[in-house]
A protein has these predicted regions:
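Conserved redox-cofactor binding core of oxidoreductases
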Residues: 3-126, 131-132, 191, 195
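Glycine-rich loop(s) and the adjacent beta-strand/alpha-helix scaffold that form part
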Residues: 119-122, 126-195
């Protein structure tokens, strides 16, 4: 997060986003400097512990990789069991935690069987979203902002087809550039996980 802030994204450093993480959590371990207990996302320890994974942690420690019980303290280097967003054995996704409680609001429309095609810009400001609803291409205007939340693959893909990304790559694909932004769609790192 601090690298985001150092890149000019004011408000996106670790200290800036931590209060929002705390606000989002309902942490089963209880409230702490890094965790909240009143949020919509239930966070819990994994219920399974395997001897092989315990030994893996011991081996990692012998190579100088510290054991950690909490990867959400701002220093996520180490080896250990990660926590999960689940409650009573069921996944507590953003849809379950945030969307389900408000899905009947009059000012919210949930589209299913729809697929975003691209975002249209006006003077580098996102103005509308083009999307497919079934076989029909539709557009919706933004009154204030457009939030892209399509995961580590979908978000950069939509940015790129909308003209945000490496200018050479966009040009080779025949996409008109809105913003030359190297790094979009590159350098994906997944979380290393053993089970």
């Amino acid at each position: 997060y601090d690298l985001w802030r150092q890149s000019g994204n004011t408000g996106w450093g670790w200290d800036d986003v931590l209060p929002y993480f705390i606000k989002s959590e309902n942490q089963e371990r209880g409230e702490s400097k890094f965790h909240g207990v009143n949020g919509p996302l239930s966070v819990s320890d994994q219920r399974i512990h395997l001897p092989l994974l315990d030994e893996f942690q011991n081996a990692a420690e012998e190579f100088g990789i510290p054991k950690t019980k909490d990867f959400n303290t701002g220093d996520n280097h180490g080896c250990g069991y990660f926590q999960v967003t689940e409650k009573d054995g069921f996944r507590c996704s953003t849809a379950v935690g945030y969307l389900n409680p408000i899905k009947n609001r009059k000012n919210l429309k949930i589209l299913t069987n729809s697929h975003v095609k691209k975002i249209n810009f006006e003077n580098k400001t996102a103005k509308e979203v083009e999307y497919w609803e079934g076989n029909e291409l539709k557009k919706v205007q933004a009154n204030r902002e457009i939030i892209i939340s399509l995961g580590s693959i979908g978000s950069p893909q939509i940015l790129q087809v909308s003209g945000i990304g490496n200018s050479e790559k966009l040009k080779n694909l025949g996409i008109d550039m809105v913003q030359n932004l190297n790094g979009v769609g590159e350098n994906l790192h997944d979380h290393l996980m053993l089970r």
